């Protein structure tokens, strides 16, 4: 697959158990991300950096998106519009309401977050999450629990892919908000 995609701009659509709205996932902020991401109907862009090993996203010119909650009709609808937006942003089709393929719109108000570390999930029977993805958690604030035992933030952070049941061995990721798309 990697050989077949060499030199291509690649778009991968997934769904998640952590967040209902679409967001983009990239390896690093490159020219493809800067050109395409502002045209996608996403809430945020996640820069994964060191957390890409073995994933398609570690290859150049690859954008991934999470379309919404797994199995939801909204995620399926979002996937359709994400695919259309990607095709319009890359000049393959006209954007809805645009006169030609060059008029794909765009915005700069999309927040960019960089993953810093994993949030491990201790062995437990029941997990809870109290924080919301992409919303700042303050130092000392309870953000999750394992068998009723609270997990408190050591320092401020933004949770990303935070879910009680998304990953077997981790709640999600600690991230920093590093700015907006430029």
Identify the role of each PLM range.
Residues 1-182:
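Structured catalytic-domain cores with a bias toward divalent-metal coordination
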